[in-house]
Amino acid sequence: AASDVYKRQVLQFITHFTDSYSYYDSACMALEGGCRWIQLRMKDAPVSEVEQEALRLQHLCRDYGATFIIDDHVELVKKIHADGVHLGKKDMPVAEARKMLGKDFIIGGTANTFEDVKMHYEAGADYIGCGPFRFTTTKKNLSPILGLEGYRSIVSQMKEAGIHLPIVAIGGITFEDIPSIMATGVTGIALSGTILRADNPIEETRRIINIEKINNK
């Protein structure tokens, strides 16, 4: 099922609206470049607009056999049967979302500390979006920056606690950062700006997926 595809993905692409690209364009390019895990993130947009965009993107992701999740909008995820939801620190708690959605939907939670990870794990999250790695322009109100040391520390505390969850690094990550971030033990990376700022976002997505394939051999 498309909803399981994300478990084998190193790259999660987060849609972003820029001067050059719409949310839909940005998702098209990431999918064309080989990404199979897309998150629609439209902070502060009216729900009706998010729904319109989500239906188009969901259709697109299904064509590519990609996992499609939506940031924050739990009710919408349930209504249109998206694959899952990503919940930020100020969004609905993971446990509450799990009650609403049941076990068949993916729920990801944002974490900045091991305590956050533990809380999400106990609440039934399927993966963790962990960051920020460094300062990022696509997000307002950032938590303290983790850097490589922060990831190493969280990954080792997870091992000690016997917590096995995919952990996706996020926040201002560039192409050059990827090998050293993956070496900390995280399972993936989430990108937005890095891909969209490239001269050719499709090629950039391919390049990112390829460095990962090389590193995993």
Where do the PLM segments sit?
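Glycine-rich phosphate-binding active-site loops on the catalytic face of alpha/beta enzymes
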Residues: 89-96, 129-142, 178, 182-205
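Glycine-rich, proline-tolerant flexible connector loops at the mouths of alpha/beta enzymes
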Residues: 39-49, 132-143
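Active-site mouth loops of central-metabolism enzymes
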Residues: 8-22, 107-110, 169
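Catalytic beta/alpha-barrel core
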Residues: 14-16, 37-49, 58-60, 64-94, ...
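Conserved, mostly hydrophobic/aromatic
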Residues: 38, 77, 120, 128, ...
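Alpha-helix-loop-beta-strand connector modules within alpha/beta enzyme cores
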Residues: 51-69, 89, 97-112, 144-168, ...
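Catalytic cores of alpha/beta
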Residues: 68, 73-83, 112-124, 168, ...
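Short, small-residue-biased leader/transition segments that mark boundaries at the very start
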Residues: 1-6
